[in-house]
Amino acid sequence: MLPELLLARVLHPRAVICSFAIPGDPGDTCDTLSDRWGITIDIFKSLNPGVNCPNLVANMEYCVAGTVSPDTPSTTTTAKPTMTPTSTPTKTTTTSTATTTRAMTTTISSDAPSPTQPGLAKDCDKFHLVVSGDNCYSIQTKYGISTDQFKAWNPYINAECSNLWADYYVCVHVPGATISTSMPMPTPSGPQPQMPGIVSNCRKFHLIQAGDNCYTINQAVGITLAQFRSWNKNVNADCSNIWLGYYVCIGV
């Protein structure tokens, strides 16, 4: 009897098939990386067996989505279903684009279309399918909703709106919400493509190059940050959401 009991405790090592990995940044910990990707510490550890939490090694790749075979008795071959994160990282650079594509699945209810971005309002009753080229400004304008409403109904979308997923649904209405009459977006004048939110009377444009930031642009053309942001209304306060290869306004 004892040999059989001992045999029942023999476990296979965990096997991980990683489908998406990212390099750690300087100062990253298991907690910060897990939080950025919306996964639990336990899932992160299971996807990265042998990881030495809490500290991570900068520039070493860590798995954040994949399939994990659990520790199982030697007599079974059952595996866990695929684990997928529920969020995208909030870190952005000037090379970010308006939409990204992730091979992940998340839904909020059986009545909602699928797939949806994570964290949508549970009482959402109207959805928008994100397509390439969409951004928060264009979606909000189309449905006549405010930035505060959009962020409240889609809390996992970050402040820079750089983590919209193409081909996923976002929430654009909840019961009782007050919205303004949506208006067709005017066709922008000037060179293309442009950052969203450029004023209609813009006369001078600048193409964002690698290494550009608001300070270097403003210094080069002799304008203030207040002027720059008044002409480029979708650029946030810390200027972390300008897009490489897009035009911004530098004069009216």
UniProtKB/Swiss-Prot annotation:
Superkingdom assignment: Eukaryota
InterPro entries for the chain: LysM1-like, LysM_dom, LysM_dom_sf
Region (Disordered): 71-98
Main location: secreted
CDD domains named among the record's database cross-references: LysM
Gene3D superfamilies named among the record's database cross-references: LysM domain
Subcellular location: Secreted; Secreted, Cell wall
Chain intervals with Low complexity compositional bias: 72-98
An annotated GO cellular component: extracellular region
Name of the molecule in the record: Secreted LysM effector LysM1
Domain LysM: 20-64, 126-172, 204-250
Species of origin: Trichophyton rubrum (strain ATCC MYA-4607 / CBS 118892) (Athlete's foot fungus)
Family in the record: Belongs to the secreted LysM effector family.
